[in-house]
Amino acid sequence: CSVRRQRQMCIRDRNKFLIANEPEKTDYSRKLVTEALRNTDKRFKTNKSVTPGFLIAALLWPELLNKCLSKGEINLKKFFRSMDPVLRKQQKITAIPRKFNSYIKDIWILQLKLHSRIGKQPYKTLRHPRFRAAYDLMLLREKSSTKKRSLGKWWTGFQKNDDNKRKLLINSLKEKDLHESFKTFGFSEELR
């Protein structure tokens, strides 16, 4: 084969070599992948740190959710059991250093914890070494969703305020009659 022909084949199949999921599968997945790549470009241009583990976690998030969905809800057992198979499938395409495996899993697990904002859980989540990366992924997930929720706004306020205001934020959730949308995990587009 000529070099030109090989280049054309690589361009045509570029998604196949990047990630082991089908970002075109849903509009939400496509938006999330696009937002993750834009975010990485923006961070790179402004000389902020860029971690391959974060990008891989974001790109594989739709694949992980796809593996653990059951009747429009996340099956938590499947969620935890699906992490390693999703990473192994990706490693057939792209080498992922071992040190990033735990980093990626931490970001994914924190997505669950970011939805739990009662009691001392928000303080524990905020102190986690991977909080910032998980927070950024949650913002990308929220940005990719058409139905906006206040999760990103809440966490932004929680991390920027002092302890008294943090308590008020937690209490404001208690005072609200927590309807079903606060009790479920994920954004509606993720659960299709």
Predicted regions and their residues:
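Single conserved hydrophobic/aromatic residue that forms the stacking wall/gate
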Residues: 1-13
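Short alpha-helical scaffolding segments that buttress acidic/His motifs in well-ordered protein cores
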Residues: 5-8, 51-59, 135-138
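Glutamate identity and glutamate-enriched acidic tracts
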Residues: 6, 22-24, 35, 63, ...
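Alpha-helical structural elements
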Residues: 9, 23, 56, 149-153
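Charged substrate- and nucleic-acid-binding regions of tRNA-handling and nucleotidyl-transfer enzymes
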Residues: 13, 88-192
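Helix-loop elements that line ligand-binding/catalytic pockets
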Residues: 16-96
